[in-house]
Amino acid sequence: MIEDIIYNWSIEKNKILIKDRWVSFEEVVYAVKDDKILDVIKNPSSNYDNQYCYIIEINNYVYLVPFVVNKNEYFLKTIYPSRKYTKIYLK
């Protein structure tokens, strides 16, 4: 269940994301709880085999949010906007 999942992230990374991309990990968690997950995939980069990615809608745009699962804890790595996935998921 989503309610049982604990989300963690780097406070410094969150500050950088807010400053540079105007989006935060708190917004991601809120979107997850608000059922805005469009998909969950393996990280498309072969360099990160241990990661998954939320494909999530925030403010009518699609973002990828890579994360690592450790029992019931999800460690969110970053957030980046995706034109490619916006075209696919928000036609």
Please identify what each model-predicted range represents.
Residues 1-91:
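Ribonuclease/tRNase effector modules and their secretory precursors
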